[in-house]
A protein has these predicted regions:
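Post-transcriptional modification and biogenesis factors for structured RNAs
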Residues: 1-177
């Protein structure tokens, strides 16, 4: 019978040790995300999958905020983050740093997530959009590609934190395969 692991058996790193661990060359960009709970959840997932940083843009809430902390469980302390007034400022900087800009958006030329495998060492910026409007068209226009999660139900939409978790896991799993 399976037995749950104790906290000791999980071998959790402290914040300072976590900051020293090699991260994936993946940056998450949040394009005008409204919900503090979604932001906190994305911080927590980024911590789990060794994402190098999160860039918060526009109206996206920034730590310290109670709701971010509640859902992040402190991951806003371990994951490096930056803020930009506009997403385009962040995209311009990332392009100068040789990142491939990958908007997570349903588009006419989107690549299905199951067909997306980053090259080893490739620097990727994953852009996730607003809960209602998605990634802004201006950002989509500047992207190197759009990635879409295949969906077969009636809604054809996922909560941004769920979407981000699926895509971050895909990048993490690809690194370890």
């Amino acid at each position: 019978m399976a037995r749950k692991k104790s906290m000791v058996e999980l071998h959790r790193l402290g914040v300072e040790d976590y900051k020293k661990v090699e991260k994936l060359p993946v940056t998450v960009v949040l394009d005008n995300v409204r919900s503090e709970m979604n932001v906190g959840s994305i911080f927590r997932t980024a911590d789990a999958f060794l994402i190098e940083r999160i860039i918060l843009c526009g109206i996206t809430p920034q730590p310290p905020k109670a709701e971010i902390h509640k859902t992040a469980l402190g991951a806003e302390e371990s994951v490096h983050w930056e803020y930009y007034h506009t997403t385009m400022e962040a995209i311009t900087k990332l392009k100068c740093e040789d990142y491939s800009i990958c908007s997570i958006e349903q588009g006419h030329d989107s690549v299905s997530l199951e067909n997306f495998t980053p090259e080893k060492g490739q620097k990727i910026a994953l852009v996730f959009g607003n809960e209602v409007k998605g990634v802004s068209q201006e950002v989509v226009d500047c992207s190197d590609l759009c990635i879409e999660i295949p969906q077969h139900g009636t809604k054809h939409s996922l909560n941004i934190s769920c979407c981000a978790a699926i895509v971050m896991w895909n990048c993490f799993a690809g690194k370890n395969s």
